């Protein structure tokens, strides 16, 4: 039996933003030769690794700010930076973020809050495809509410409405609700640069409507034809790894 296709928030948002980028990222293997290392990805991956270790209740080796800074140094990724100076500036900024976030987490640790998982892969069968999503952290709050925490290393602010309107956060809530059907579920984005958080929760009706929308979008992605992937100029073309590929297509005009 053939495996059911899988779609993730990143795949879905990529297709909605640019079907051509989806093609080169996930469908046509030629695209991988055009991918370049990104400094923001290296920076974010490093911070995620530190917080994964710190919040993993099974990892007793990272419990203090000093431990977290040690893991930061060990985990640092230097790929994608334009110069050594740019990398050093980012390294210093990341170190300050780790100190601030971990200090705050230790000082404000809430009674009754338990981390259930870090870097947890959630799945749900949505009929023609399987929806998957990897959450940075999954907490159980004192009242039994399941909280999904998503770290954002590039944001300088975050609001409740942004969390509510975020496709990935809605996907995570849908997936978490499948795993914990009798629990309330909430989503939180943690903007690491400013150490600020915002949370939102979709109602059962909102989740039902969202699930129907995602199924429809998924069907569109899975049934996409060659013409659907036709490259068309748009603002996000500037700086895209695949611009050279799209320019080779006579339809790109």
Which residue stretches match the model-derived regions?
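C-terminal, charged and often intrinsically disordered regions of DNA end-processing helicases
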Residues: 1-41
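Hydrophobic (often cysteine-bearing) scaffold residues that line and stabilize catalytic clefts
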Residues: 39, 43, 47, 90, ...
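Non-catalytic protein-protein interaction segments used by genome-maintenance enzymes to assemble
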Residues: 117-176
